[in-house]
Amino acid sequence: MAAGVDRPFRPQRYELFGLERQLFGMGHDAWVGAFGYPKPESWQKVYRERYGKEPQSRPDPRHAVDFIIEEVRKHPGELTIAEIGPCSNLALAVLKAPDIVPLIKRVIFMGGSFFKPGNVTPTAEFNWWFDPEAARIVVRTPFREQIMVGLDVCEKMPFSSDRYQAFLAGQRPEMKKLLESTYAGQQFAKDKAFSQYVWDVLAAAILIDPSLITEECTCAVDVNAEFGPSYGQALAYPDNGPQGSQKARIVMTIDQERFWNMLTAR
């Protein structure tokens, strides 16, 4: 793990986030990520508070942007990048070292909501809304292949209490304790009707086995980076997109049975 960018591209967005909410409102999901917390004093303090003990290892000393650049150059044509958060680090990497773009085998995004409403705002999905300028840079980069795992597929697959219990079964005591301490674990313990989507896990599964995809469409994609009510919205153009946009595979459906079996396999 390497520490990376701690601010979105737009200047002072963190400081002015409260005003942004007043102006544009929010969606059905109240999660706002790092915008909802003060900046931590150190990663060591966060670790101690979260796990109640001293860290047993340290992050990679390289900045995440340099880590991406160096590893791609070291393994040309071999690496698939799983972009399962805001796109800030990857955006800076391709701006700093554009030579890595043709060396990346594939980029799989957990991000965007192309044909349905957003979650954190009525139009935008969280990861791309958090740093729309970075997301726009990355999706407009001419990678060999881009696969979009957005809300279009993720919100078809709720993680229910039954699936959670199946996932817990057979876990080592340490892992079980960790899972039960998470927000989802606490909610499942209180409410058997609770469910949650597994956005990032789904993107990781497709990275491991792209044949999970059973329905998709290929479109030119873009991100609205104009500051306003639709800031961060994912845009899909079945025919001709705006100049600079790139074609991407947008996942619509996957083999759910295979996915859930993959998640609980030992």
Map each language-model feature to its residues.
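Conformational coupling and interaction surfaces
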Residues: 129-133, 145-266
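Active-site histidine-anchored catalytic micro-motif
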Residues: 7-14, 37-156, 161
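Active-site rim/loop-helix segments in enzyme catalytic domains that contact anionic ligands
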Residues: 1-36
